[in-house]
UniProtKB/Swiss-Prot annotation:
Forms a heterodimer with GatD. It comes from Staphylococcus aureus (strain COL). Keywords: ATP-binding, Cell shape, Cell wall biogenesis/degradation, Ligase, Metal-binding, Nucleotide-binding, Peptidoglycan synthesis, Zinc. The active site is at residue 349. The keyword DNA damage does not apply. It catalyses: beta-D-GlcNAc-(1->4)-Mur2Ac(oyl-L-Ala-gamma-D-Glu-L-Lys-D-Ala-D-Ala)-di-trans,octa-cis-undecaprenyl diphosphate + L-glutamine + ATP + H2O = beta-D-GlcNAc-(1->4)-Mur2Ac(oyl-L-Ala-D-isoglutaminyl-L-Lys-D-Ala-D-Ala)-di-trans,octa-cis-undecaprenyl diphosphate + L-glutamate + ADP + phosphate + H(+); beta-D-GlcNAc-(1->4)-Mur2Ac(oyl-L-Ala-gamma-D-Glu-L-Lys-D-Ala-D-Ala)-di-trans,octa-cis-undecaprenyl diphosphate + ATP = beta-D-GlcNAc-(1->4)-Mur2Ac(oyl-L-Ala-gamma-D-O-P-Glu-L-Lys-D-Ala-D-Ala)-di-trans,octa-cis-undecaprenyl diphosphate + ADP; beta-D-GlcNAc-(1->4)-Mur2Ac(oyl-L-Ala-gamma-D-O-P-Glu-L-Lys-D-Ala-D-Ala)-di-trans,octa-cis-undecaprenyl diphosphate + NH4(+) = beta-D-GlcNAc-(1->4)-Mur2Ac(oyl-L-Ala-D-isoglutaminyl-L-Lys-D-Ala-D-Ala)-di-trans,octa-cis-undecaprenyl diphosphate + phosphate + H(+). Belongs to the MurCDEF family. MurT subfamily. Signal peptide: none annotated. Pathway: Cell wall biogenesis; peptidoglycan biosynthesis. GO terms for molecular function: acid-amino acid ligase activity; ATP binding; carbon-nitrogen ligase activity on lipid II; zinc ion binding. Disulfide bonds: none annotated. This is Lipid II isoglutaminyl synthase (glutamine-hydrolyzing) subunit MurT. Zn(2+) binds at residues 202, 205, 224, 226.
Amino acid sequence: MRQWTAIHLAKLARKASRAVGKRGTDLPGQIARKVDTDILRKLAEQVDDIVFISGTNGKTTTSNLIGHTLKANNIQIIHNNEGANMAAGITSAFIMQSTPKTKIAVIEIDEGSIPRVLKEVTPSMMVFTNFFRDQMDRFGEIDIMVNNIAETISNKGIKLLLNADDPFVSRLKIASDTIVYYGMKAHAHEFEQSTMNESRYCPNCGRLLQYDYIHYNQIGHYHCQCGFKREQAKYEISSFDVAPFLYLNINDEKYDMKIAGDFNAYNALAAYTVLRELGLNEQTIKNGFETYTSDNGRMQYFKKERKEAMINLAKNPAGMNASLSVGEQLEGEKVYVISLNDNAADGRDTSWIYDADFEKLSKQQIEAIIVTGTRAEELQLRLKLAEVEVPIIVERDIYKATAKTMDYKGFTVAIPNYTSLAPMLEQLNRSFEGGQS
C-alpha cells in the first residue's frame, strides 16, 4: 500500500509540476521517497541490468548515447535522460518509466550521490568517464572523492568499465574483481595540450607517474616503477577525425557521428563499451551512434539561414578548455557568449576560471565576447588578464546576452555553466526557431 501511494502521489506531482511550466524531474522522487523510503530499492529489484554512468565530464553525453542506441534498437529502458542525476531524480525516473517489460536501466549519477544511492541500488555495471576538478567545494579534493567512491563500490560484485587512460579512474580497479578497460591508442588524435594537470602522481606509492604518451591533461599512457600502469584496453579508438563532427575508428569499425568536439570521442567510446558489454553488436551500435544528435546543450548545433551556433556546457577548467577549442576548429569569424553563475548548484567557488586557458582566444578571429551571469564581471576581468583584445560586452541577463549574438554575422559559440544552461539554451531555441537544430 505504501509503495502504491508513493507512486501515485509522485505521478500527480509530476503532472502538477509540468502544469506550472517546470520539468518535474526531482519533485516526484522527493515526494515518493518521503512516503516510502524503500521505493527506489523496490523498483530497482524489478530490473535485470542497471548501468550507472559517472565521472566529472561527459556523463550526460555518454548516458544519452547509450539510451538513444538502445531505444533505436527497440529496447525498452529506464533512463534519467533529463539530467536529474541525484537520488530524487533517479527515483523519479524509475517511477515514471518502469513497466513489466523494462529490464534495463541507464542511470547518470552525480559523483557525490554515489554513496547515498548505492545504499538503495546496486548496479550490475558502472562506467566512469574521467575525474577532473569540478565544484570541489561540494566534494573536497579529487583524491578524497575517488577514495570515497572506491570504498562505496567495493565488494558489491559490480562490473566496472574504466577509462584506462585516466589514472584517477583506473585506480578504481581496487574496488572490483571484474574490470573492463576502454581507452585510446597513442597518436590516435592530436589533442590540444593544456598547462592544467590534475595530478600525475601514482595513487599507489605517490611517486611522479612516467608518461609514454599524453592525450591531454592527465589522460594518456602512463606507468610507475611500483607497477601501477595504464592497463590494456579491450575497447579502443585507434584513430579519429573531427571537422567538427566525429568520425571514429573503434576496434576497426568506423562510426560517422553527428556530435562535435574531440573530447566527445572518449564519451562515445565509454558508451560503446557499455553497449558491447550489454551484448549489442557493431551494427546495432552503429544504428544508434549515427542517428544521435544532441538536444541538451552538449555540443548542440543550430542553423538558420546563414547564421550558425553551437552551445556546450562548461563547469570546470577541462570543460571550458574543450569548449574554447571548438572555436579553434571553426573557420571564419566567431562571437562568444560565456556565462558564469555562482548559484548553489554551480558551486560558490568560481576561481576555477583562472585555471582555464582563455589565452587561446587571442589566436581566434572574434567579433566580440559577451559575458553574462551573476559573475559576468569576473569573467570580464579574466579575459582582460588573458589579454584578449576584442570587444568584451557585459550583459548580466543571460537571455539578453544570448539574443545579442544574433546581431553578429559570425558563428556563435555559447558556453554556459550549470545553472546558465537552461536560459541560454531556451534563448537559442527562440532565436533559431524555424531553423535547424
